């Protein structure tokens, strides 16, 4: 046994040394410096070293001895000798037990732009303050590396973390509550030991994995291994189907921003789930090769092993389309441009040699290599094809995931809040809605700019659909005829926004227009482009998990007036009588004409979605106002900016100012915190008619007011909306705390427990914020959540991309609770968040009423419109 263990240690050290050499090979001098000094900076703590803070900061790594280069560097900076080892150096009792890099570092997937993920494994006896100081030290080292242009992220890992199934929070690379064993799987197969103890897990044969602790204890009992010499993070025991689900959802979350990087991992998890529960994790395959002395896959390269496993899976299900895609993703990740001939005198690196062998096996020709190598020059047509292909692949993985959940009758182990955040990000990125600007270039190509863009208007009655067409060509007959347009939309605002936010339209683009009988000419178009580019940055930081879990709010809003229809055009060739003292742009002159002919809305919300809406006609101001205000729940933050762009031929400044004043006043009324005035209203005269905007608790309604009696009657009626609604014998109010959560466009359920804990009330707000109230309900809230989720997932499929049908925006569930005497709304967190296995099942609509909760149908629903 002793000789067997010694042989394994030698193999393990040899593989680790190979990975270290590969991590340094072909990398920049700065990368080599940072990567090589990380162990030194964590081992020592000195005012002259990066990462120093005052106080008792845990430092020192078990069994670490700096090499000559590291020692010289430290001695030079500190003017002191670091030749003497620390106390406890050989006992394994220093605070840091091991320093490991993980991920693509040292693999064929490492490139000059790769970041470095470092696990700093520490003793479990560090207290909270000590961990906080060590975390601060790591943060300062990250900042030092960042100043040198190297992206390093440290993760503090308690050596008992995985034994206790502890999890981080969503948003970090440790994936929130959605991963545990799978995170350890990735670490074990990609880890490179920079300093500290060896990993005990590698010494345990695969066949003993399910008896991990017993086998380890037997090795200790025999004296073959000494406990303090090894880092023991635990075995890769039995995985739950819930963890597969959570991890796969997390990979889809990451694929929104980095599709080429994440799609390979997504399909690996799909391959795992296909073999569940009898499959073998990739780390176990690697360990089996190590124990057998089989140094396969180009030196047990973690990235090549992942590709090989995914290839086996896709071939087994005859999915050659996705197989071709993951090979291209792999090729692009490696970043070795094989179509560029190397100098004969320059030796080819190991990564280039491996990739050359692979593309030969795949039978790729030079033309395909040239296209992939030229990705930095891809333009919109190729990028959009790539985006749709990646999207179809992700949706295929999502559908397979739902089938897996249904097959295994899942209740998800991820917290409801994490699942809500994950699905919201997918919804924001992928759900196709009218007016939403689809962003087609998530890190596919760095530059989609076009030198020439032509917007052509086709009026009604022609062979082609009426509306606007966009071409990436100059506007001459030869360039346009016979070529497909890049994009079409009925309204110019949407088309300009699409070209701008996708990076086609830049300050260097030549923009042309063929306006037909539209009011928008070349001058207006250039003004619109200038206004949008001045007020809307293309890139913003990704939305935070908190923003994704909250109702979406308008952040930046532009109100575009008279772009396509301009009533003031007729003032150029006729006499118009009006009173300068009564310049009302909404009811102008003797004819009381509304000078607002069209309004386009362009806004970005807190989920980073970009939306456009179009209104035309006399009522466009009223309709757009109601729409804007309806998208603001009462507790929403005011938009960071509200801009009015006006393109009227005449009275432009007056119209812009009046619209700005009106919108600002209405937003203030909508978001005012004074809820003692449920009857707040705004009267507005448009084209000789008086309208009332009524600011109610949950929405804003509009009513035409023909005379004084109707006017004051409407105001009085509106105030009555604030009074309680009676159900049965008891008065049931809509709790005021709900107001801050009411959000149009989504179904919301609020559960309120009564003094009798066996019964509860339900308040349901539909997508238009109409209210249904059910009182004295009995039964299982969890079952209701499950049934409602299943109902909406099967009957509200609005997401359409090719053959994909996914609805991410499921109903949201909350509970109204008392905390320290104050009423609060919290995410519903019952025994489970519904069974995700039911998502995607086809259920008849009446299923919800065939198994009602007791009391759920005992009271008539009251609707507020």
UniProtKB/Swiss-Prot annotation:
Ranges for region Catalytic: 1-540
An annotated GO BP: cAMP biosynthetic process
Keyword line: ATP-binding, cAMP biosynthesis, Cytoplasm, Lyase, Nucleotide-binding
UniProt-annotated stretches for the region Regulatory: 546-865
EC number(s) from the headed UniProt entry: 4.6.1.1
Main location: cytoplasm
GO cellular component entries: cytoplasm
Entry's Gene Ontology molecular function annotations: adenylate cyclase activity; ATP binding
PROSITE patterns: ADENYLATE_CYCLASE_1_1, ADENYLATE_CYCLASE_1_2
Subcellular location: Cytoplasm
InterPro entries found in the cross-reference section: Adenylate_cyclase_1 (IPR000274), Adenylate_cyclase_1_CS (IPR024686), Adenylate_cyclase_1_N (IPR024685)
PANTHER family: ADENYLATE CYCLASE
Family as reported in the entry's similarity comment: Belongs to the adenylyl cyclase class-1 family.
Protein name: Adenylate cyclase
